[in-house]
Swiss-Prot record:
This is UPF0225 protein plu2503. SUPFAM superfamilies: NTF2-like, Sec-C motif. It holds the Pfam family SEC-C. It comes from the Bacteria. NCBIfam families: PRK01617.1, PRK01752.1. Belongs to the UPF0225 family. InterPro entries: NTF2-like_dom_sf, SEC_C_motif, UPF0225, YchJ-like_M. It comes from Photorhabdus laumondii subsp. laumondii (strain DSM 15139 / CIP 105565 / TT01).
Length: 159
């Protein structure tokens, strides 16, 4: 039985993000690192999240927070909005939205972020992310399918 990758690629997990999470392969693009990090949140893989953070971020100090977030957060869907090159070939940005269920409040929430990635020695790393300019929502049409994967229209679900 095959399992679709949680990153939303439509590809089997074993052929998509699983090799990254097992450190069998390294992400060749910022977008593939972004998708694999999302899958790591879904699959509760703190080790991968920590090692895919830029070394200067010292992500190991956040391990407990990351692991506790697994208990109260159920990730429902990812929508990659744009991917763009940075100032050089070793910098890139990925804008995305992701829907999750906060188990404490039982509310669906939508995160919207523009993440920055840096490449060092042919390996991509997540360095930081910012919320896009206030008032600008992700480019999801109100009648588009919700990125959470519910099958409902965005306006009837997370929008």
């Amino acid at each position: 039985m095959t399992e679709l990758c949680p990153c939303g690629s439509g590809i089997d997990f074993a052929d998509c993000c699983s090799p990254y999470l097992q450190n069998i392969k390294f992400a060749q693009t910022a977008e593939s690192l972004m998708r694999s990090r999302y899958s790591a949140y879904v699959k509760h893989n703190a080790d991968y999240l920590i090692t895919s953070w830029h070394p200067d971020c010292q992500a190991e100090k956040w391990r407990l927070d990351i692991e506790q977030s697994f208990i109260v957060t159920q990730w429902l869907g990812l929508n990659v909005i744009t991917t763009e090159k940075g100032e050089n070939d070793n910098e890139a940005y990925v804008e995305f939205s992701a829907c999750f269920l906060d188990q404490k409040s039982q509310d669906k929430q939508l995160i919207h972020e523009r993440s920055r990635f840096l490449r060092i020695d042919q390996h991509w790393y997540y360095i930081d992310g910012v919320k896009p300019i206030d008032g600008i929502k992700p480019q999801i049409g109100r009648n588009s399918p919700c990125p959470c994967g519910s099958g409902k229209k965005y306006k009837k679900c997370c929008g």
